[in-house]
UniProtKB/Swiss-Prot annotation:
A GO BP entry: tRNA wobble uridine modification
Coiled-coil features, chain-numbered ranges: none
Record key words, sorted: Cytoplasm, GTP-binding, Hydrolase, Magnesium, Metal-binding, Nucleotide-binding, Potassium, tRNA processing
PROSITE patterns: G_TRME
Compartment annotation: Cytoplasm
The protein's name: tRNA modification GTPase MnmE
UniProt binding sites for (6S)-5-formyl-5,6,7,8-tetrahydrofolate: R22, E79, K119, K453
Class of the enzyme per the UniProt entry, highest EC level: hydrolase
Length: 453
């Protein structure tokens, strides 16, 4: 843990009404004496002159002092709130750095100090950056939920349950004559099943939180000439893709990034899927399947003039069978202007079905509302927590260890191996909040923050 005293501009660079300089560390009181001639009363706004080394006034403003550990970073913190001119702020930072032992903060170092001093866990620290970077009200609300500890609470509950079960299993191992009875009486199995079910729920919520933060990747897929490129253009609100009556016009992957009520949506238009001898088209089809493999949702585009079927298993069973497990699919029956179909949404064998005309725009707004709901949009803004890709990976790793532990229990009654899988699951979960985290990961996370945060 660093013992340096750090300084940085806490407000955005450039011209503004107010500019804030933040200092954190043991030398914050030395800085106060040098710049203000006194240490302000803790947690009181003090109007002061900010002076240079020759006792000349650089600026005038509000000084705030927070005595550690009752501060954001857990250290002594001094904030100087002056006028927002960049030259004045630069002069003030230079003055602060004339105090021996003070240096410029690295990006995210204030938040890192808060984490290292147990003022925040890692998910809460990340939520600060996510709140700043939020591109929608929903993302901001979810980031605030994480900052207030909603995600951490879920993870801590899982860690506690895994730890308690691990201790119970290890206690059984310590009594080898009774180990088999302990493992086979159903108590351990039931506890493990409850943990796995709880983790599944948290994973679903985290995936939703990741979509709110990073956006949802939606791949438009289907046979040639189903209207995929027309739908891309309709969703994007511009002519992004070339549209013709010639099957196979789209040979490569086309991408559009749009916002629906501020929520990011990444739309991927792909080549029509079919058997072909054309080398270039084959490459496009391979790329289409690669995009589908990493999608959050597939819009299965169907030419409504070629079939009356609505169940995707009836329309194209080979396509549905090849899709990744648990990948959500929305069936989009296109050309409703020609078929005269009702635009009402329906459900077929668990699949959402929408009727639209990508050419005229009929039903497109309803499809947009559907995509918004999939991204977790809620008009009352009572959304869940925000999540990052690393959180999803850690949850997936924990889930895999729990599944392996389940196998060790059910098939082999192997207590020691079950305990080891529980230990690995515990470590994976604890990495989310930073209980067990490498220095490399901390550096990567906090270096992406703003300087001054």
């Amino acid at each position: 843990m660093t013992t340096d005293t750090i300084v940085a501009q806490a407000t955005a660079p450039g011209r503004g009404g107010v500019g804030i300089i933040r200092i954190s560390g043991d030398l914050a009181t030395n800085v106060a004496m040098a710049v203000l001639g006194k240490v302000p009363k803790t947690r009181y706004a003090d109007y002061c002159d900010f002076k240079d080394a020759d006792d000349r006034v650089i600026d005038q403003g509000i000084a705030l002092f927070f005595k550690g550990p009752n501060s954001f970073t857990g250290e002594d913190v001094l904030e100087l709130q002056g006028h927002g001119g960049q030259i004045v702020l630069d002069m003030l930072i230079k003055r602060v750095m004339q105090v021996s032992g003070v240096r410029i903060a690295k990006p995210g170092e204030f938040s890192e100090q808060a984490f290292l001093n147990d003022k925040l866990d890692l998910t809460q620290a990340e939520a600060i950056a996510d709140l700043i970077d939020a591109t929608s009200e929903q993302a901001a609300k979810s980031a605030l939920q994480s900052l207030q500890g909603e995600f951490s609470k879920e993870v801590h509950e899982l860690v506690e349950q895994v730890t308690n079960l691990r201790l119970y299993v290890e206690a059984a191992i310590d009594f080898p004559d009774e180990e088999v009875d302990f493992l086979s009486d159903g108590k351990i199995a039931n506890a493990l099943y409850r943990i796995i079910a709880k983790l599944d729920t948290v994973q679903d919520s985290a995936k939703q939180g990741s979509i709110i933060r990073e956006g949802m990747k939606v791949v438009i897929a289907g046979r040639p000439n189903a209207g995929k490129s027309s739908l891309l253009n309709a969703l994007a609100g511009k002519e992004s893709a070339i549209v013709t009556e010639i099957a196979g016009t789209t040979r490569d992957v086309l991408r559009e990034h749009i916002h629906l009520d501020g929520m990011p949506l990444h739309i991927i238009d792909t080549a029509g899927l079919r058997d072909t001898l054309d080398t270039v088209e084959k490459i496009g089809i391979e790329r289409a399947w690669a995009e589908i493999a990493t999608a959050d949702r597939v819009l299965f585009m169907v030419d409504g003039t070629t079939t009356d079927a609505v169940d995707p298993h009836d329309i194209w069973p080979d396509f549905i069978d090849r899709l990744p497990t648990r990948l959500g699919v929305t069936v989009v029956r296109n050309k409703a202007d020609l078929t005269g179909e009702s635009l009402e949404k329906s459900q077929e064998q668990g699949f959402d079905v929408y009727r639209i005309s990508a050419k005229t725009g009929l039903g497109v707004e309803e499809l947009k509302q559907h995509l918004k709901s999939l991204m977790g949009y809620q008009s009352n803004l009572e959304g869940g927590f925000i999540a990052r890709r690393r959180h999803l990976e850690a949850l997936e790793l924990a889930a895999s260890h729990l599944q392996l532990g389940k196998e060790q229990l059910e098939v082999y009654l192997a207590g020691e191996l079950l305990a080891e899988e529980l230990r690995m699951a515990q470590m994976a979960l604890s990495e989310i909040t930073g209980k067990f985290t490498s220095d490399d990961l901390l550096g990567k996370i906090f270096s992406s923050f703003c300087i001054g945060k």
